From Swiss-Prot:
A divalent metal cation binds at residues 102, 112, 146, 176. Involved in the heme and chlorophyll biosynthesis. Catalyzes the aerobic oxidative decarboxylation of propionate groups of rings A and B of coproporphyrinogen-III to yield the vinyl groups in protoporphyrinogen-IX. Belongs to the aerobic coproporphyrinogen-III oxidase family. One of its GO terms (molecular function) is protein homodimerization activity. It comes from Prochlorococcus marinus (strain MIT 9301). It holds the Pfam family Coprogen_oxidas. This is Oxygen-dependent coproporphyrinogen-III oxidase. Homodimer. Residues 266-301 are annotated as: Important for dimerization. PANTHER family: COPROPORPHYRINOGEN III OXIDASE, MITOCHONDRIAL, OXYGEN-DEPENDENT COPROPORPHYRINOGEN-III OXIDASE, MITOCHONDRIAL. It is found in: Cytoplasm. Keywords: Chlorophyll biosynthesis, Cytoplasm, Heme biosynthesis, Metal-binding, Oxidoreductase, Porphyrin biosynthesis.
Amino acid sequence: MLKEPPKNSREKTKNLLLTLQDKICSGLENVDGKGKFTEESWLRDEGGGGRSRVLKNGSIFEQAGVNFSEVQGKELPQSIISQRPEAKGHEWFATGTSMVLHPKNPYIPTVHLNYRYFEAGPVWWFGGGADLTPFYPYLSDVRNFHNEHKKACEKVDQDLHKVFKPWCDEYFFLKHRNESRGIGGIFYDYQDGSGNIYRGNNQKGEASKASQNIGRSNLNWDDLFSLAENCGQAFLPSYLPIIEKRASQAYSSKEREFQLYRRGRYVEFNLVWDRGTIFGLQTNGRTESILMSLPPLARWEYGYKARKNSREEFLTSIFTKPQDWLNDKELEKFCIENNIFD
């Protein structure tokens, strides 16, 4: 049986996620130098509300959205009950901060972050993660993003990243395209300190295998709160150095067209596969905030084929497939030889 969360669990997680929203927005405004976030507060008829912040047409970001929400309800959607049937019949509470950034320059990756907390009767859990979607990737940028999140996980438990990295690869996968959305990062869900770390549906996947090797989780509520805090704080150091390196990199209409084409994959994932989008729409969430993740511009092209050994081909042949980004020496050698390391 789960241990009860602290009496102030809801207020504590709410404050953590509000602070995360503030820090991220401040950091992004500083690096953009031109754009400013506009805030819109909203209330939900069934209980709760949030604040949506969007930056448009900055010097770096074509569109950046950082949302906070805190919502309550009486009827849980089927998508939650199917995962945690013991929550059925209980009033529920959910709070989260989510972010999607769509930069102008195709050499700066799109990035997504989400950290959340949920309670319903005897059930509670933390979830979250961050993932990077480059269009013209460099291995050094990919490594920095992964390494910062690995360090954040290991502050709480040395084993978590071994599960969260492959879980991210598994979750952000477009089954209808048979490719990853990007180069991954970390992803976790339904973390309540009981049972195995992995709580996904693919019991034959790499995340499940890693979790089985590790065994049962012994993390408590405070550990999982610290995990969300550490991982949230890891975002800016994982991403801002990429902006600083790539913001002045020149690009042509060809790279811009490819960026818009690949953004189409982002749209496809978010509307077809993403559980957060589905949960928000099923619970009468604020549609504008839920769909904030979509890029302002995207395009589709029938039967697109990249030129052999081009940067565009390297994206689909290497950087949309799960890799051991931090340790694979053959991958490092290939990237150096093809000028896509740094």
